[in-house]
UniProtKB/Swiss-Prot annotation:
EC number of this enzyme: 3.5.1.135
CC terms in the record's Gene Ontology section: cytosol
Family membership: Belongs to the N(4)-acetylcytidine amidohydrolase family.
Signal peptide from the UniProt entry: none
PANTHER family hit by this protein: UCP029143 FAMILY PROTEIN
Domain ASCH intervals: 7-93
Function according to Swiss-Prot or TrEMBL: Catalyzes the hydrolysis of N(4)-acetylcytidine (ac4C).
Catalytic activity, as annotated: N(4)-acetylcytidine + H2O = cytidine + acetate + H(+); N(4)-acetyl-2'-deoxycytidine + H2O = 2'-deoxycytidine + acetate + H(+); N(4)-acetylcytosine + H2O = cytosine + acetate + H(+)
Active site: 21, 24, 74
Protein name (record): N(4)-acetylcytidine amidohydrolase
SUPFAM superfamilies, per database record: PUA domain-like
CDD domains hit by this protein: ASCH_yqfb_like
Amino acid sequence: MLLNKITFFERFEHDILSGAKTITLRDEAESHVITGQILPVSTFETDRWFCDIQIIDVTPVKLTELTEMHAKQENMTLPQLRDVIAEIYPGLEQLFMIRFRILLQ
């Protein structure tokens, strides 16, 4: 079943709105989106809408395959990215990279 919205922690809102964050790494349950799909984006904490995004593509990626390029697209260093993934998805190896672009209002 396709996602009909996506949430991000509030701490990522500025990076998304500024265009600094252009991907998100998710588990399998949150990977059900398709190229071209438009999703409303809300904060995880309060479900407050702050923008819409369009999905560019979805690619499986293992935690061990993450590179500095992934980290740059997340607007983090690689160690920061690995720490965030470990915090959100402890013990998970298989991730899905969702590349997106923000839709201007």
